Amino acid sequence: MASSALICDTEQWKGLQAHVGEIQKTHLRHLMHDVERCKAMTAEYEGIYLDYSRQRATGETMEKLFKLAEAAKLKEKIEKMFRGDKINSTENRSVLHVALRAPRDEVINSNGVNVVPEVWGVKDKIKQFSETFRSGSWVGATGKALTNVVSVGIGGSFLGPLFVHAALQTDPEAAESAKGRQLRFLANVDPVDVARSIKDLDPETTLVVVVSKTFTTAETMLNARTLKEWIVSSLGPDAVAKHMIAVSTNLELVEKFGIDPKNAFAFWDWVGGRYSVCSAVGVLPLSLQYGFPIVQKFLEGAASIDKHFRSSSFEKNIPVLLGLLSVWNVSFLGYPARAILPYSQALEKFAPHIQQLSMESNGKGVSIDGVQLPFESGEIDFGEPGTNGQHSFYQLIHQGRVIPCDFIGVVKSQQPVYLKGEIVSNHDELMSNFFAQPDALAYGKTPEQLHSEKVPEHLIPHKTFQGNRPSLSLLLPSLSAYEIGQLLAIYEHRIAVQGFLWGINSFDQWGVELGKSLASQVRKSLHASRVEGKPVLGFNSSTTSLLTRYLAVEPSTPYNTTTLPKV
C-alpha cells in the first residue's frame, strides 16, 4: 500500500513556507550589499566556481534548506543510488550511471554483483574497435576506410551525445583528433532529418551506429532501415555488416537486421536513456570521432563530480546547492521555469540536453509512492548561448516574468581571438556580458535613477527595471573534455537532488507511453487508408477530420516502391 507521507507535511517544509514572507520583504539590490552573505554564498571544486549570492535567499534560507534536505533523507538517498539500491521503484531497477565513469578498481553493485568490470569490458571493446576504425584497418565494402559516422537514436540516445560532440568540436585537442572525420546524428523520424544526416555523404565511407537498447524503438528502427536501404542500394546487401554497427542488448534482433553481433556494444537496464551519455550510447560514436583517450577524459571529469557529490558537505556541494535552490525557487517562490544561459557557443546543445534530463526526470505529479503531489514540482527548462539569447528572450526575463537564470561562463576560450587595437578580446567581450547580466537582473533600474538621467517622463515606466530577479553564476576554468564531463555530472546530480527532495521517482518516464500507444493506432489507420482505401474509423470527430484532410492529398511517396531522400 502506498505511503501517504510527503515532504510538504514536515515541519521543515512548513518552516520554509513561513520564511517566504520574510524573503518577499527583501530586494537583491539590498541583499547584495552584505559582503559576508555574498562570500558565504559561494562554493568551489577543482576550479569550478559557483556564486549563488543573487538568489532570493539569505543565510537563514540556506539553513532551512539544509534542514529540509535532512528531513528528506537526502544523504541516505544519494548513498542508496551509489550503492545500487533499486531506487527506480516503478521499474524495480538500480540507477547507476555513476558506474559508467567509475575507476576500474571501484566496486558498485547491482543485484549483489559488481558492475564495474562489465562496464570496463564494454569500454575496452569500444577502445579497441575505435582504434581499428580510426587507423583505417576497418574498411567498408569497397575496401575504402570509413571516415563518416551517423549515429541513429532518439531522446537520451541523441541529445546527450550531441551536446558533448558540439562542445568538443572546437576544443583544440579534440578537433585535432577529429581531423578529416564527420560525426552526425539522426533522431527525428521526419524524412527531412534523414536527408540532412546523409547530405553529401558517400555510403562507401560511412559507418552507421544504430542505438536502441531493445532494437524495437519505432522511430530509431525506421531510420535505421532507411539508412540500411541507402547503403544497400549503393553497395549491395553484403555491405550492411561492414557499414552498420549497434548499441543494443538484443543481439537476436541485431543479427536479424544484418549487423554482426560481434559489432554490438551493450548497455544495461540500470542506465536510463537520458543518463546514458557515458555508456556506449555516447562513448562509441564520440570515440569513433575523437578517439577513446579524449572520451576517457570526459568520463574522468564526470567521475570527479561523482566523488564531490558523494563526499562533500552539503554547504559546499555544488550539485546539492543547485538542487536545493531549484526546489526553493519552484516550490516556495513559485517560479516554474529556469533559463540555462551558457556564455559559450560550444555549449549550444547543452540547454536542449538539460531540458530533456530535467523535464523527463522531474515532470511528475505523484510521489514515488503514488500519492498526488499538493505542491509544484519540476521545472520548464530552456536556454540559448549568450550573447544570442540577449537579443532573443532576455527582454521577458528583465521586464516580464520572473525566471531564475543559470549563467555558465568559461575563463579560457577554446578558440581565443584578439584584434590589435580593440579594447578587449572577443572572449572578454563575451564575458563582459556574462558578468553584467546577473547584476542587471538583480539590481534593475529605478524611476529615481531614470529621473537623474533626465529620461523623458513618458518613457520612465518603459525603462524601469524592477530587478530582484534571481540568478546564479557557474564559472568553469576552461572547456576541455574533462570540464565538459564535470558540467554534465553537475546537472545530472542537481536534477536527482530535486527529485530526492520532492520525493518523486526521477528515473522513470511513463509520460511518454500514452502518446506512443495512440500513435500506433493512427499508424495502423494510415496504412489501411493508404494501401486498402479504407475510411478513417475509431477516432473522435476532431482527429477523424484532421486525418481525412491529411489523407485527401495524394502522398508524395507511392506505397508500391522505395523512395530515398533526393538531397
From Swiss-Prot:
Compartment(s): Cytoplasm
UniProt entry keywords in alphabetical sequence: Cytoplasm, Gluconeogenesis, Glycolysis, Isomerase
Pathway this chain belongs to: Carbohydrate degradation; glycolysis; D-glyceraldehyde 3-phosphate and glycerone phosphate from D-glucose: step 2/4
Domain of life from the UniProt record: Eukaryota
Residues binding D-glucose 6-phosphate: G156, S157, S212, K213, T214, F215, T216, T217, Q356, E360, H391, K516
GO cellular component, one term: cytosol
Recorded catalytic activity of this chain's protein: alpha-D-glucose 6-phosphate = beta-D-fructose 6-phosphate
EC number: 5.3.1.9
Pfam family, one: PGI
Any one biological process term the GO annotation gives: glycolytic process
Molecular-function GO terms, alphabetical: carbohydrate derivative binding; glucose-6-phosphate isomerase activity; isomerase activity; monosaccharide binding
Residue numbers annotated as active site: E360 (proton donor), H391, K516
Oxidoreductase is among the record's keywords: no
SUPFAM superfamilies noted in UniProt: SIS domain
InterPro entries: G6P_Isomerase, G6P_Isomerase_C, Phosphoglucose_isomerase_CS, SIS_dom_sf, SIS_PGI_1, SIS_PGI_2
Primary role: Catalyzes the conversion of glucose-6-phosphate to fructose-6-phosphate, the second step in glycolysis, and the reverse reaction during gluconeogenesis.
Family: Belongs to the GPI family.
Assembly and interaction partners: Homodimer.
The protein's name: Glucose-6-phosphate isomerase, cytosolic A
Species assigned in the record: Oryza sativa subsp. japonica
